[in-house]
């Protein structure tokens, strides 16, 4: 039952994503714009760009995910789908988890694929790329899960884009610190395993708690 519900929701979301494929490209284009602006602002000095490349790439991915966060549940709230979720024979937290996975796949996964190209724009040293990809692979799902809780808290409010950002950014800061810090540690010849393990631990905790918290927030918003 839960697997069939997940397949149905993913199929619906993929159809909606295809119909709004122009909107789905916005996070990737925004991240590219952030990287290009940093490259232009810092000049053509490769050493200066390489020094800030991990932080810039992490910041670009974070802001790109934040751009699409307000729409995570808003469309479903407007067309009545969230009420159907609450009446579905599967747990609400499961549908929230599936939707969050879809959000990660549409906003963060393309950026993970494009990270080597974006790293070349910033002269990222090749030996730092595996650590950067590992930190993004662990950190971006964590960002999506934290963002789902914030989006659920504000789903009943109109024009809550700024409020979503204000609530989400403080939660994102530790992920950004450990994600960019792992690459900085590798650049200094230190072991980045500690920061990566902290990201992994945060992801495991968020996988358990974030869908439950988001589901509770949706129930409160619709009650």
Please place each PLM-identified region on the residue numbering:
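Junction motif at the cytosolic side of a transmembrane helix
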Residues: 204-223
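Transmembrane helix boundary and interhelical loop/hinge segments in multi-pass membrane proteins
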Residues: 66-86
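Hydrophobic alpha-helical transmembrane segments of multi-pass membrane transport/permease proteins
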Residues: 21-43, 58-61, 167, 171-178, ...
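Long, hydrophobic alpha-helical segments
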Residues: 53-69, 73
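Hydrophobic alpha-helical transmembrane segments that constitute the membrane-spanning cores
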Residues: 97-122, 142, 146, 179-180
């Amino acid at each position: 039952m839960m697997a069939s519900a997940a397949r149905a929701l993913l199929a619906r979301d993929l159809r909606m994503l295809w119909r709004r494929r122009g909107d789905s490209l916005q996070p990737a284009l925004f991240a590219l714009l952030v990287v290009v602006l940093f490259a232009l602002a810092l000049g053509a000095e490769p050493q200066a760009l390489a020094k800030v490349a991990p932080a810039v790439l992490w910041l670009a991915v974070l802001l790109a995910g934040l751009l699409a966060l307000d729409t995570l549940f808003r469309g479903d709230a407007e067309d009545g789908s969230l009420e159907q979720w609450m009446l579905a024979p599967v747990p609400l937290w499961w549908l929230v988890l599936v939707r969050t996975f879809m959000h990660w796949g549409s906003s963060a996964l393309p950026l993970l694929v494009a990270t080597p190209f974006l790293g070349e724009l910033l002269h990222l040293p090749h030996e730092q790329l595996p650590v950067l990809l590992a930190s993004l692979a662990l950190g971006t799902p964590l960002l999506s899960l934290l963002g789902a809780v914030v989006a659920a808290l504000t789903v009943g409010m109109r024009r809550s884009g700024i409020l979503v950002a204000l609530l989400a950014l403080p939660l994102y800061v530790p992920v950004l610190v450990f994600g960019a810090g792992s690459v900085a540690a590798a650049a200094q010849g230190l072991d980045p395993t500690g920061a990566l393990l902290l990201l992994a631990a945060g992801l495991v905790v968020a996988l358990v708690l974030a869908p439950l918290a988001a589901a509770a927030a949706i129930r409160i918003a619709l009650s």
